[in-house]
Amino acid sequence: MKLAVDTHTHTYASGHAYSTLIENARAAKQNGLTLFCTTDHAESMPGAPHYWFFSNQRILPRFLEGVGVIRGVEANILNTQGEIDLHSSVDHNLDWVIGSFHEPVFHPADKAAHTQALIETIKGGRVDALGHLGNPHFDFDFEQVIACAKTHNVAIEINNSTLKGHSRVGSIDRCYEIARVAKSLDAYITTGSDAHFCLDIGGLSLASQLIDEVGINPQRVITHTARQFLDFLELRGRQPIEEFAGLL
């Protein structure tokens, strides 16, 4: 499947990534993206920036190197109450919020705790997508969580970096099963490179392959076209982004 949007990318501001926003934008252009989301780690991750960094994204131009820039964050799920490490004052300056588990912030517990944390995060209404769910350290009830995500219009991320098999080892088969459950429940799917270096921006081939193999309806893949992604943001309650009105 052709994918026009990369919804999960990092700059050096994350503390363990190595490129600037301009470098990422250039790579996005070279790889044929229409939009990309800049989603550095929120402040609870070691080395991550202060929340002002995210609030101040309002100064970013809407286009860099001819590619549309979506202002975002990869927030950390903090607890079973579904709290995330992002000041609520930042919300109105962002377009896109991923909620993810990371071991340094949320110590792996048990399936019930992970399931509760994900469901409460979804119900909290502040995250637009759940990131890299395949991690076996954070097992959860696939059916229960994805059904909740479907009800609340929260997208399920297919993470290309995970599918390479080098990080979150043991995730690949789980990613395929998560995708199959998402297909059966007609949930929304998003795709992210999780790039920590600019050469990986737009690297979505493994995610695209998974989508094709599982047979997910392109209309449920919000990154299939820029317009589908922007329509999803509006479905989530975001205001239309005037500068992107002409994107297809």
Curated annotation (Swiss-Prot):
* UniProt keyword Disulfide bond, yes or no: no
Annotated keywords: Hydrolase, Metal-binding, Zinc
Give GO terms: molecular function aspect only: phosphatase activity; zinc ion binding
**Which biological process, per GO, is one annotated for this protein?**
bacterial-type flagellum-dependent swarming motility
Cofactor(s) named in the record: Zn(2+)
The positions annotated for binding Zn(2+) 3 are E74, H102, H132
Q: Which residues bind Zn(2+) 1?
A: H8, H10, E74, D194
Give the highest taxon in the source lineage.
Bacteria
The UniProt note on the cofactor reads as follows: Binds 3 Zn(2+) ions per subunit.
According to the UniProt entry, what is the EC number of this protein?
3.1.3.-
Q: Which GO terms describe its cellular component?
A: cytosol
Entry-linked CDD domains: PHP_HisPPase_Ycdx_like
Annotated binding of Zn(2+) 2, by residue? H16, H41, H196
* One Pfam family per UniProt: PHP
What family name appears in the similarity comment?
Belongs to the PHP family.
Q: Which HAMAP family match?
A: YcdX_phosphat
UniProt-recorded name of the protein: Probable phosphatase VCM66_A0854
Q: Give the classification, highest ranks.
A: Bacteria, Pseudomonadati, Pseudomonadota, Gammaproteobacteria, Vibrionales
